[in-house]
A protein has these predicted regions:
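Helicase motor core with emphasis on the C-terminal RecA-like subdomain
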Residues: 1-182
Length: 182
């Protein structure tokens, strides 16, 4: 006789309506369920970086690439930095531009997106976990469900495709109790 019952868990840092989420998760079981919510404040530090000269369209042509030299000091100050770019093509361009500006970064920065070979993506993720990378230029491939404790800073180039995505990306840094997300 099996006395074990199915348990359903829903875990999220960004779900807005917890009661609605609980109803969706629990409806197949016809049970009420319990909401457990951490009552912790999360410190978030946001810094905007702008070009020295504001042109008509400061990011025209190549999204923010002219600000790559302003990103380098941020990378240098942090243990590990994730640089989120919205498209694969621009992530490759940013990765190469950072290497062109500072060739000494070779071997300490990496690229991660869905078209990168799975073996290389796994290598990047492992080296993020162990703190062996200074920075990773990435797309949404590192948005969700990842916990890389060495990450101290997240840079978002351009606008993310929504507030929830921005919060997910910001939450990749300082991903431990009491740590500040930057």
């Amino acid at each position: 006789v099996n006395t074990h019952q199915l348990q359903v868990w829903g875990i999220s840092a960004t779900v807005g309506n917890l009661d609605e989420a609980k109803a969706v998760l629990m409806s197949p079981l016809k049970e009420d369920g319990v909401i457990v919510k951490a009552n912790m404040d999360k410190a978030i530090e946001v810094e905007s970086i702008f070009p020295d000269e504001i042109e008509k369209y400061p990011w025209a042509g190549h999204l923010g690439i002219k600000l790559a030299d302003k990103v380098l000091p941020i990378i240098e100050k942090s243990r590990t930095t994730l640089i989120f770019i919205n498209t694969r093509g621009m992530s490759e361009r940013w990765y190469q531009t950072l290497l062109d500006i500072n060739p000494d970064l070779a071997g300490s920065i990496a690229l991660h997106h869905g078209s990168v070979d799975m073996e290389l993506r796994n290598w990047v993720e492992e080296n993020l976990h162990t703190g062996n990378l200074k920075a990773v230029v990435c797309t949404a491939s590192l948005d969700l469900g990842v916990d890389f404790r060495p990450v101290e800073t997240v840079i978002q180039v351009g606008s993310p495709k929504g507030v929830a995505r921005f919060l997910q990306r910001a939450g990749r840094s300082g991903h431990r109790p009491g740590a500040k997300s930057r």
